[in-house]
A protein has these predicted regions:
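N-terminal intrinsically disordered, cationic/polar leader segments
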Residues: 2-190
Length: 190
């Protein structure tokens, strides 16, 4: 059996899980509600406060989907009870971030867009279910992405980081707070 897939998921008291026909699972908690449709071959059972996933056969596909289903269910339960967050740091001279309403404006040293038009800032709008917090006065400037959907939080953080990934020579750019940049030595003079 899959080592991940066979582990039961403990459902907290303030979280309710409903399993509908077609393996549609809805998890409701204090932070919100998540709904996901899972592979119909997996058998998802709620017994008391434990959620278990079993697979029909030991075929390779069933084994891989078994662990995936359990991990996604666990992410849903943790998301609606505790939530997820990712912190990004902006490092560089003149690099700034400001929150205006539901939009975060990033000034990351770009003077031109890829099509040659002038570009001073990137505007990122908060999607549904995600909150962006900017600590403008902190050194380095930090942006915290929060939400109940782990995949959406990670995707939004990756989009922000992708606007100016950190470079290895000076370390300038947008990086995750726990990310270590492998630094390179510059040119050696004659």
């Amino acid at each position: 059996m899959s080592r991940i897939g066979r582990m039961p998921i403990t459902v907290p008291a303030n979280v309710t899980v409903t399993i509908a026909d077609g393996n549609v699972v809805t998890v409701k908690g204090p932070l919100g509600t998540l709904t996901e449709k899972f592979n119909s071959r997996m058998m998802i059972k709620l017994e008391g406060n434990e959620l278990t996933v079993t697979r029909p056969t030991d075929e390779k596909e069933d084994r891989s989907v078994h662990g995936l289903t359990r991990a996604l269910l666990n992410n849903m339960v943790v998301g609606v009870s505790q939530g997820y967050s990712k912190t990004l740091e902006i490092i560089g001279v003149g690099y700034k971030a400001a929150k205006v309403g539901k939009t975060v404006e990033l000034y990351l040293g770009h003077s031109l867009m890829s099509n040659g038009k002038p570009q001073e800032k990137f505007c990122i709008v908060e999607p549904e279910g995600i909150t962006l917090e900017v600590a403008e006065k902190a050194v380095p400037i930090t942006i915290t992405v929060k939400g109940i959907d782990k995949q959406a939080v990670g995707q939004m953080a990756a989009v922000i980081r992708g606007k100016r990934p950190p470079e290895p020579y000076h370390g300038k750019g947008v990086k995750y707070a726990d990310e270590r940049i492998r630094r390179k030595a510059g040119k050696t003079g004659k």
